[in-house]
Curated annotation (Swiss-Prot):
Biological role: Plays a role in formation of mast cell secretory granules and mediates storage of various compounds in secretory vesicles. Required for storage of some proteases in both connective tissue and mucosal mast cells and for storage of granzyme B in T-lymphocytes. Plays a role in localizing neutrophil elastase in azurophil granules of neutrophils. Mediates processing of MMP2. Plays a role in cytotoxic cell granule-mediated apoptosis by forming a complex with granzyme B which is delivered to cells by perforin to induce apoptosis.
Cellular localization per UniProt: Cytoplasmic granule; Cytolytic granule; Secreted, Extracellular space; Golgi apparatus
Region Disordered: start-end pairs: 86-145
PTM per Swiss-Prot/TrEMBL: O-glycosylated; contains chondroitin sulfate and heparan sulfate.
Glycosylated residues, chain numbering: 90, 92, 96, 98, 100, 102, 104, 106
Presence of the UniProt keyword Ubl conjugation in the record: no
Cellular component aspect of the GO annotation: cytolytic granule; extracellular space; Golgi apparatus; Golgi membrane; mast cell granule; secretory granule; zymogen granule
Span of the signal peptide: 1-26
Family designation: Belongs to the serglycin family.
GO molecular function terms listed in the Swiss-Prot or TrEMBL record: collagen binding
Disulfide bonds: 39-48
Originating species: Rattus norvegicus
Residue ranges, annotated region (24 X 2 AA tandem repeats of S-G): 90-137
Annotated protein name in UniProt: Serglycin
């Protein structure tokens, strides 16, 4: 019988231990963290700040994206850090208008009989009107997205209002030609 060198036995034993050890431990847990962007626009600039929550383990059997802001670890770490955006930003407006008009008319008539007579008349009129209106608004159309990310820190941010995004997605690209 041929003898196996000692180095080969050592390599085989090490490979067996590594394969057996990895099958016993299972797959490594995936770690994730919630990341979000908070914006306070002031005219020209968006003034956005990227914020991160604590890390947590993703369970393979469950969905990797939970409902926003329902993770107890996240809520325990940052209980007073969130605010409704519509309280800070609101707007109002007003307007008025007026108008005027005029008109004129004339008429004449004659008649005969045992006597004779004639008549004429004229008239004019004018009118005016006015109106006003007011309104208010808030940034309620901003869509907040919270999503857990894996450890590679790949994050997709969406800075625009939700209704504007829907119309922009259906826009024709410069390369699209309609004949």
């Amino acid at each position: 019988m041929r003898q196996v060198p000692v180095g080969t036995r050592l390599v085989l034993a090490l490979a067996f231990v590594l394969v057996w050890g990895s099958s016993v431990q299972g797959y490594p847990a995936r770690r994730a963290r919630y990341q979000w962007v908070r914006c306070k626009p002031d005219g020209i600039f968006a003034n956005c700040i990227e914020e991160k929550g604590p890390r947590f383990d993703l369970i393979a059997e469950e969905s990797n994206v939970g409902p926003p802001m329902t993770d107890p670890v996240l809520m325990r770490g940052f209980p007073n850090d969130f605010f409704p955006i519509s309280d800070d930003y609101s707007g109002s407006g007003s307007g008025s208008g007026s108008g005027s008009g005029s008109g004129s008319g004339s008429g004449s008539g004659s008649g005969s009989g045992s006597g004779s007579g004639s008549g004429s008349g004229s008239g004019s009129g004018s009118g005016s009107g006015s109106g006003s209106g007011s309104g208010s608004g808030s940034l309620a159309d901003m869509e907040w997205e919270y999503q857990p990310t894996d450890e590679n820190n790949i994050v997709y941010f969406n800075y625009g209002p939700f209704d504007r995004m829907l119309t922009e997605q259906n826009q024709e690209q410069p390369g699209d030609f309609i004949i």
